[in-house]
Amino acid sequence: MRAELLAVGDELLYGDIVNGNAAWLGRQLADVGVTVTTSTVVGDDIDMIATAIRVALDRADVVIMTGGLGPTQDDLTREGIAAAAGVGLRRDDFLESMLRRRFRDMGRGDGGRRVPQMNYRQADLPEGAQPLPNGTGTAPGIRMEIGTGVVYAMPGVPFEMNGMFTASVLPDILRRAGQPAVVVHRVLRTAGMWESAVAEALADEVDRLARIGNPRIAFLASGGQTRVRITARARDRAEAEMLIAPVETAARTALGAGVYGGADDSLEGVVLGLLVQRSATLAVAESITGGLLAGRLTDVPGASAAFRGGIVSYATEVKASALGVDEGLLAAEGAVSSRTAAAMAAGVRSRLGATYGLATTGVAGPQPQEDKPVGTLHIGLAGPDGTVTRSVRLPGDRPRIRTYAVVSALDLVRRMLAGLPNSEMTTTGDGAP
C-alpha cells in the first residue's frame, strides 16, 4: 500500500512551525510496511488543498492529512476535501452535540454553557464523510472515500493527531491493506566507516533483497554514524525474526569491526562498558571538541565508574601548561598535528591518573588554521602499551565537524579496547565517520 502525507498550514510554509507530524507518521507507517511515497505541505487555500488531494490520490492509495481542522476562517481542510470530492459540507448533528458537551465539560464558552459560533465549523463534514473521534480536543478528524482512495484528515496538534492516528486511522489502513500486520526492525549501529563504505559493503545483499522484496535494508546516517535497518513483514513476529536472521548475519559479516551495537546501544555507552569490563579508566583532553566528548561520556548513567574527567585545552599555551605538551613540539608542528594529539593524550593520562588518555585537536572552521584545512582532525589515545593516533579529514560545517570528531574519538577507543583494526579513517576521506 502506498500513502502520501499532506500537511496544511501557512505557518509550515513560512517556517514558523516545523512539520514534525510528517516524521512521526512516516515512522508509524514504515513500521507496518506502508510505503510513504511523498510528503507535501500546502498553504491555507481551498483550491490548492483540493488540487493537492487530487494529485495525491492519483499516486497513492491513501492520503493522510494534518492541520486545518480548527474553528477559525483560515482552517480550510474541510472545504478542501469537499472541493476535491465535488461535494458540499453538511452540519453533523452528533458532532454538534458532542461539541456542546465538550465545551460544557471543559467549562469553556459563555460560562461553560454556550459554544462560540465559530467553533460550530468543527461540526461540519464533507457530504459522504465519516468523523474520526478526537479524545483530547474539539476538532474531529475526517475519513472520506474519493474514487478508489481514502483521505484521512487529522488535527495538526501533535498529541491530538497521535491519538487519533493510533486509535482510528492506522487500524482502518491495516484493514484496507489486507497485509501482514507484523513488521519487525533490526538495527545495526556502525562507527568508523564512511556511509558510502557501509553501503558498498552491503551492496550485494541490498541487490539480492531488492529482487525478493522482503526483508529490506535501509541506511540512516546522522550524527556522524550510520545505522543499518533491516525490516521484515510477516504474519507473526517469529516469522519476521526468521526472515531477518540470515540478513543480519550477512550484514555483520560484511561490516565487520564497523558494527558496535544495536538499536538501543550508544557508542559512548559501549566504550564505557568495555572500560568497566577491563577495570580501566579514561581521561580526555579536548581542543576541537571543546568539552563535547566529556559531555557525551557523562550523559551515560554510571559513567563515573570508568571516566576520570577531562581538560579543555583550547588555547595552544594551555596544551603546554595544563597537559605538559612540549613547547618545542608545539612550535615545530603547531597545535593541530598527530604528534600533538599523542602528546595531549599522554599528558591527560598522567595528569588525571587514568588508564587511558584520549585527545582531540583539529580545525572546525570556518577558517583554516596553521595552514591546515577546515575539517582536519587528529586523535591521540595513550595507554599502558603506548600511543596510537587517527587522522582524518571531516566534511561539513563547524557543528557537524565537532560532532563527527567526538564519534571518531570514541570509535578509536572502542576499537583499541576490543582489539579491532583502527579502521579506514586513518586516511583522509569523505562522508560521515
Swiss-Prot record:
Domain of life: Bacteria
InterPro entries: CinA, CinA-like_C, CinA_C, CinA_KH, Competence-induced_CinA, MoaB/Mog-like_dom_sf, MoaB/Mog_dom
CDD domains noted in UniProt: cinA (cd00885)
Coiled-coil portions: none
Family from the record: Belongs to the CinA family.
Protein name: CinA-like protein
Annotated organism of origin: Frankia casuarinae (strain DSM 45818 / CECT 9043 / HFP020203 / CcI3)
Highest classification ranks of the organism: Bacteria, Bacillati, Actinomycetota, Actinomycetes, Frankiales
